[in-house]
A protein has these predicted regions:
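Substrate-binding/active-site clefts of carbohydrate-active enzymes
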Residues: 1-122, 130-154, 173
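Short, intrinsically disordered, charge-balanced linker/junction segments flanking boundaries
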Residues: 20, 336-339
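Glycine- and acidic
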Residues: 23, 96-99, 132-133, 272-284, ...
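Conserved, mostly hydrophobic/aromatic
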Residues: 44, 54, 117, 128, ...
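Acidic, His- and aromatic-enriched active-site or binding-groove loops in soluble protein domains
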Residues: 71-85, 185-197, 328-335
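Short acidic/histidine-rich active-site segments
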Residues: 308-313, 317
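Aromatic-rich peripheral "rim/lid" segments of glycoside hydrolase catalytic domains that contact
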Residues: 319, 323-331
Length: 339
């Protein structure tokens, strides 16, 4: 049965794949009409849900400098991308290229995009993927006061929307607790995730650190920012699901095609006595208690709580902690697990 059953009672979510705003049999899928998107957001608002749009302004699909031309490379390569003196792409995104976000042209593009979603679709906020890239200048150097982030924070149209940063990038820049905020930006608290995972699995010496995280991470978010700047989470779309966190000691990404070399190798997981699916009722019972422990800790912590869709009914990705590339049962929500 589900851990948080009420979360699963919204019919439109049960009928909607996570990769589309319409029913999968509709024929339009991810390229649904504006009307359908409006309807989806309106329905969410009717149920008292706010809609936070995940936006990726850190790279495009063109890969590295040897990749194809899909979008901005053909317009003005030097304006839209961070380039080395030799003309190669800086790769702070892990995807082969990095968008030159603080160039005035790119900055204006991003601002207009955010305004459009706010005005036309009435989204309630934005979560910025690998947001530390948005703090870098054209050479990749982090800036104390990035013009793009300041412009977003001070924009009149965006003044009431929520701004949430994934405060790190694939180039090693980690800004949890130090992301430029103008008292507007919240952050995914990656320290909360890592420390609470270790505490819950029984790692020695973590009790004091866990108390700090549960009580609002004041070491990271002192006033005036405070605990409202800390988006607490134990799991997200990157990494193990919450059930898998207590069902697998190691990742199992073999079906991704990279010989299990992709994905995080340090998930602080614990399989509770058996690797993967098991019929042992004691092990399965322990796993469900651990999931409940994680939810109880998360929901009793100071600051906004976030959990991964499906964790409330112990959804599994069968040990795959990098399932973005899978469109099979590995990445699907199995609603029968709430029964």
């Amino acid at each position: 049965s589900g851990i948080l059953n009420p979360v699963t009672k919204i019919d439109i979510l049960k009928e909607t794949p996570t990769t589309a705003v319409l029913d999968a049999n509709d024929g339009m899928g991810m390229v649904a009409s504006k009307k359908a998107m409006d309807m989806c957001i309106e329905k969410a608002h009717k149920y008292g849900m706010q809609v936070i749009l995940d936006v990726v302004f850190n790279h495009t699909a063109e890969g590295n400098e040897k990749g194809p031309i899909f979008s901005f490379k053909g317009f003005d390569n030097r304006i839209y991308y961070m380039l080395t003196p030799e003309g190669w792409y800086y790769n702070f995104s892990g995807c082969g290229n990095t968008l030159n976000c603080n160039h005035p042209v790119v900055q204006q593009l991003i601002l207009e995009c955010l305004r459009y979603w706010t005005i036309e679709y009435h989204v309630d906020g934005f979560r910025f993927d690998l947001a530390s890239i948005l703090t870098r200048d054209e050479k990749g150097t982090p800036m104390a006061d990035p013009p793009l982030l300041q412009a977003i924070a001070c924009d009149a149209i965006l003044g009431k929307v929520k701004l949430i940063a994934e405060a790190w990038d694939a180039g090693g820049l980690y800004q949890v607790g130090s992301f430029p905020s103008w008292n507007r930006w919240s952050e995914w608290n990656g320290r909360y995730r890592d420390d609470i995972r270790q505490f819950l699995k029984g790692t020695d010496g973590m009790a004091g650190t866990a108390i700090t995280r549960i009580t609002g991470s004041k070491d990271l978010y002192p006033e005036p920012r405070g605990d409202s700047a800390s988006v607490n989470f134990v799991t997200c779309h990157d990494g193990f699901t919450l059930y898998d966190l207590y069902a697998y000691n190691t990742k199992h990404n073999e079906k991704n095609g990279w010989n299990n070399t992709d994905g995080d190798n340090n998930g602080n997981s614990w399989n509770c006595g058996a690797e993967g699916e098991t019929d042992d009722p004691q092990i399965e019972g322990l796993r469900r208690r651990m999931v409940k422990n994680a939810f109880a800790t998360l929901l009793c912590s100071r600051g906004p709580a976030m959990f991964y869709g499906g964790d409330e009914f112990c959804n599994t990705q069968f040990g795959n902690n990098n399932a973005y590339c899978q469109d099979i049962i590995i990445s699907w929500l199995d609603w029968t697990r709430q029964e």
